[in-house]
Design a protein with these regions (language model features):
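Short beta-strand/loop motif that positions the catalytic acidic residue
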Residues: 175, 181-183
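Acidic catalytic loop of the alpha/beta-hydrolase fold
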Residues: 186-190
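Gly/Ala-rich beta-loop-alpha elbow adjacent to hydrolase catalytic centers
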Residues: 70-74, 78
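Conserved alpha/beta-hydrolase catalytic His-Asp/Glu region
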Residues: 103-105, 120-173
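Catalytic histidine-centered segment of alpha/beta-hydrolase-like enzymes
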Residues: 213-222, 226
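Flexible "cap/lid" loop of the alpha/beta hydrolase fold
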Residues: 83-84, 89-119
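Short alpha-helix in the alpha/beta-hydrolase fold that links the catalytic acid
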Residues: 19, 177, 191-200
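Active-site loop/oxyanion-hole signature of alpha/beta-hydrolase fold enzymes
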Residues: 18-24, 29-69, 227
Length: 237
């Protein structure tokens, strides 16, 4: 029996609560809060986050048939897990995820650092987060903005640095788990098409590009994303 595991990133509140629609859709699914997102010490690399996640899952007796669904940092962790422990992973679903260091607009990291120290920049940072939620239902958007207030810009800065050092290009051809990649076609972050790069590097992978969807497909188009995951898993028994 599949064990669904949803892994969050620095966006969408920087919290596991962003997967509310998936947790309802998949009874028994899990969504850990990564260390450093209010509680615990943050990890300094995707590899260390992966080991933390594996320990967390093993402590719950979840060691096989894992379906890892990750967003941004969570997607990188899921990918690393699939590469390191292929016998434990049934399938991977990666959203807004790349296999190489991110290309960021100049000042992106500095903006988060300044937001942690300057009230006006902090306000601008929250408005930036709100703008990225333009495709999200208002109630969930407001809840995730409240999560961002708690977690704060420094946590997001640390996560960005971790992502900027992640590079799996030299191992991607060894990935064994079935792979579904999902991207919002109208992402206001205007990032490169990282998901297509992975799709082209992994034979047999599936790539879904959702229209009228931004940076957070699972929270903006939950019905479509859940259906895509259902069909992807059903096709693989």
């Amino acid at each position: 029996m599949n064990q669904m595991v949803f892994i969050h990133g620095p966006g969408a509140g920087g919290c596991a609560e962003s997967f509310v629609h998936q947790l309802k859709h998949y009874p028994g699914s899990l969504a850990p809060t990564l260390p450093g997102h209010l509680e615990g010490e943050p990890c300094r690399s995707v590899e260390r986050y992966t080991e933390w996640l594996r320990g967390w899952l093993w402590s719950k007796g979840k060691r096989q048939d894992l379906v890892l669904v990750g967003f941004t940092l969570g997607g990188s962790i899921a990918l690393q897990y699939g590469l390191d422990y292929p016998d434990e992973v049934k399938a991977l679903v990666l959203m807004t995820t790349g296999m190489r260091p991110r290309e960021r607009r100049p000042g992106t990291l500095e903006f988060r650092l300044k937001a942690a120290a300057d009230p006006e920049t902090y306000r601008q940072w929250l408005e930036t987060m709100r703008h990225q939620f333009l495709f999200m239902e208002p109630e969930l958007r407001d809840h995730l903005i409240a999560c961002h207030r708690k977690v704060g810009p420094l946590s997001q800065h640390r996560d960005f640095v971790v992502l900027d050092h992640f590079d799996a290009r030299d191992r991607i051809n060894t990935l064994k788990a079935p792979l579904l990649l999902i991207k919002g076609a109208d992402d206001p972050a205007a990032q490169p098409e990282y998901e297509r790069e992975i799709h082209e590097a992994v034979p047999g992978s599936q790539y879904l590009r959702l229209k009228n969807t931004g940076h957070f497909p699972f929270a903006e188009r939950p019905a479509e994303v859940n259906l895509a995951i259902d069909e992807f898993l059903a096709a693989r028994g």
